[in-house]
Amino acid sequence: MKPVIALVGRPNVGKSTLFNRLTRSRDALVADLPGLTRDRHYGEGRMGERPFLVIDTGGFEPVAKEGIMHEMAKQTKQAVAEADVVIFIVDGRQGLTPHDKTITDFLRKSGRSVMLVVNKAEGMKYTMVTADFYELGLGDPYVISAAHGDGVSDLVEESLDIAFAQRPPEEEVPESKDRSIRLAIVGRPNVGKSTLVNTLLGEERVIAFDLPGTTRDSIEIPFEREGKLYTLIDTAGIRRRGKVFEAIEKFSVVKTLQSISEANVVLLLLDAQQDISEQDAHIAGFILESGRALVVGVNKWDGLTSDRRDEIKIDLERKLGFLSFAKTHFVSALKSSGIGPMMKSVDNAYAAAMSNLSTPKLTRALIEAVEHQQPRRKGSIRPKLRYAHQGGMNPPIVVIHGNALDAIDANYKRFLEKHFRETFSLVGTPLRIELRSGKNPFSRSEK
């Protein structure tokens, strides 16, 4: 499980600046939740070999009772509940404010690990910029400049150390799970995720209802279907209570992102009775960016008129056309209709994502592609593609070597991707193409 860091503080203390630095400006990978003026943003960062999720919150008024500030406070409280570590940011130039004290009182009651961070400390001595903030009783403050990056690496390293130290040791995964397909079912609330889980498990092991609270605990449910082993990764907030699993249809962005990152295959479930939303597209975008194999399921298909079915298909093509590599199935989780073929596509997507592609076959496919259509010249230079090899799995990565490959445009790269897909039957998985140019023997070099 990736640790979760929440950035909290009053308005304009530098939360978004720090967020953009931690995520290298890839903010809002799964963008704003609907219906709110200012929502929390989620992004993914990495420190060395340690990935993490980071939440950027709006300005925080813990005691706000109504209006925009009340909604923002709710969002921030949810972010704190989802976090392993809270980075509480204050403004070193403005000094301590009553607002900072109010936020401190809330954070102390939350039970979360809190790191006090003094931002905007450029050119100021540590003792001078931190003196006021000891009054908050949160220990020695960390001093950073989010704008310039000073002190940020040390801050993140320390926060990750805290996050990992307070987590229970992970249990050893049984050998049977190692051979299973790790499946995450994701989607907006009430699209039928828990009903589909019930159908897949073949018994009423999951109870679907809304519960308050968070969905921070990760669980895995092993199951077998037609002789194949799967491990269902919690996405809808499935929690163990005694021997029963409860599915909380309370949408958790953190849970969704973590589940996607831990899966071999992601099943994106949509609701045929509703139009495809911006939130659906954002989730799909994150799945694509994560490189996970994908199957799309359109649930509640039974009982729809032919006109409505046509509308949905047009909507799919228009809003989720970038998922054309994935199989789409029209199903009814409640009536178990279409589930078998959909799970077959899960198997096929997994097989495609884990394909072992030999260098001779990849190179032969590359030569065939170039013979069919050569890349365009860029000025007087025509790129030369010489050979290809596999650079990774899940998703498959095809590394192409040659000369002047930086002259290849996006259209030709898409052509190559399509050719490799068709040649190797890579359905249901993203495919990455990497271009590596050798040195041009005719270019000038330093003697």
From Swiss-Prot:
Instruction: Write the record's keywords in alphabetical order, separated by commas.
Output: GTP-binding, Nucleotide-binding, Repeat, Ribosome biogenesis
SMART domains linked? AAA (SM00382)
Which positions are annotated as binding GTP 2? 187-194, 234-238, 299-302
Q: Name one GO molecular function term.
A: ribosome binding
Q: Biological process (GO) annotations?
A: ribosome biogenesis
Binding-site positions, GTP 1? 9-16, 56-60, 119-122
- KH-like domain location: 355-439
Q: Which family does it belong to?
A: Belongs to the TRAFAC class TrmE-Era-EngA-EngB-Septin-like GTPase superfamily. EngA (Der) GTPase family.
User: By what name is this protein known?
Assistant: GTPase Der
